[in-house]
Amino acid sequence: MNRLKEKFQKEITPALVSKFNYKSVMQVPKIEKIVINTGVGDAVSNSKTLDNAVEELTQITGQKPVVTRAKKSIAGFRLREGMPIGAKVTLRGEQMYEFFDKLVSVSLPRVRDFRGVSKKSFDGRGNYTLGVKEQLIFPEIDYDKVSKVRGMDIVIVTTAKTDEEARELLTQFGMPFQK
């Protein structure tokens, strides 16, 4: 069993039950899924960049991403409906905990001038979104093989009803929020 999953069952669940006075342990919020999305705008002119982005996401997450396509045509961006413009991965279960553990303990501390993640990035329904400016913070990415620095959005979806519950859950998991 994963280190974080074990910690959730043994330490975090009792702590949240006592803090929020839940009647049942089933009311305790948990991380449902993590969605990693990267937009590749250059894919319109050069399809090889999309292949590189897909390969990097596969290395980071250990799961093959889905190629996302344009919903509408936009003449200003020379974009046609249905053109591939990005990639996304949805992680659940064991892989989700592995990725979250790696994100919190290895990748985020590698960010330059890192002072913690923003507390304001909750959406009002207990989900947390975080933007990463470069994929180089992940240990799986080889610096010499990177053709272009790309960012990505990481959405952590929880079953929490409020932002306060979600913030407490992520703090217990070791998410480094700003002071």
Swiss-Prot record:
Keyword match rRNA-binding: yes
Keyword Transcription on entry: no
A single Gene Ontology CC term: ribonucleoprotein complex
A GO biological-process term: translation
Keyword annotations: Ribonucleoprotein, Ribosomal protein, RNA-binding, rRNA-binding, tRNA-binding
PROSITE patterns tied to this protein: RIBOSOMAL_L5
Record GO terms (molecular function): rRNA binding; structural constituent of ribosome; tRNA binding
Superkingdom of origin: Bacteria
Pfam families linked to this entry: Ribosomal_L5 (PF00281), Ribosomal_L5_C (PF00673)
Record text on subunit structure and interactions: Part of the 50S ribosomal subunit; part of the 5S rRNA/L5/L18/L25 subcomplex. Contacts the 5S rRNA and the P site tRNA. Forms a bridge to the 30S subunit in the 70S ribosome.
PANTHER family in alphabetical order: 60S RIBOSOMAL PROTEIN L11-RELATED
Record's function text: This is one of the proteins that bind and probably mediate the attachment of the 5S RNA into the large ribosomal subunit, where it forms part of the central protuberance. In the 70S ribosome it contacts protein S13 of the 30S subunit (bridge B1b), connecting the 2 subunits; this bridge is implicated in subunit movement. Contacts the P site tRNA; the 5S rRNA and some of its associated proteins might help stabilize positioning of ribosome-bound tRNAs.
Family: Belongs to the universal ribosomal protein uL5 family.
Record's protein name: Large ribosomal subunit protein uL5
Organism: Bacillus anthracis
Gene name of the encoded protein: rplE
